[in-house]
């Protein structure tokens, strides 16, 4: 399951942050943990662990899918984890599939994404995802 490279990343993140990760990792689905540690660099993982509360990070890594982890840039993932209300993110995931969310996030600039998450308005976020995903499916 965990290969040596993943184990080394876990150890390095623990060393740099002073956080013990086994309790965090045991609360997150294994597929999500593996995706996060395979797709993200140590520096990105360290920043996430250092800048987001453990409870929010656990919730975020539990609901953010492996597809989202692998197809959204690390910078934008950090923005979602740091500035997003995970309950709102979870509601959006219930309404839209990962594909629509990935398309929308990838089309937004980092500043637009940060602003949208800070506003934390479910209806506005839904409209943005719908418009960007719909425009993408029409080839716009």
What would you call each of these model-derived segments?
Residues 1-140:
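General marker for long, soluble alpha-helical cores
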């Amino acid at each position: 399951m965990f290969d040596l490279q993943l184990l080394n990343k876990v150890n390095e993140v623990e060393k740099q942050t002073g956080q013990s990760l086994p309790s965090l990792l045991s609360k997150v689905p294994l597929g999500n943990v593996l995706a996060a540690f395979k797709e993200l660099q140590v520096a990105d993982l360290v920043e996430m662990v250092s800048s987001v509360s453990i409870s929010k990070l656990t919730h975020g890594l539990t609901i953010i899918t492996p597809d989202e982890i692998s197809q959204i840039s690390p910078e934008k993932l950090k923005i979602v984890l740091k500035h997003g209300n995970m309950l709102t993110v979870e509601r959006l995931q219930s309404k839209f599939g990962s594909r629509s969310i990935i398309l929308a996030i990838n089309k937004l600039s980092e500043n637009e994404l940060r602003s949208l998450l800070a506003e934390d308005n479910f209806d506005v976020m839904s409209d943005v995802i719908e418009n960007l995903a719909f425009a993408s499916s029409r080839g716009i």
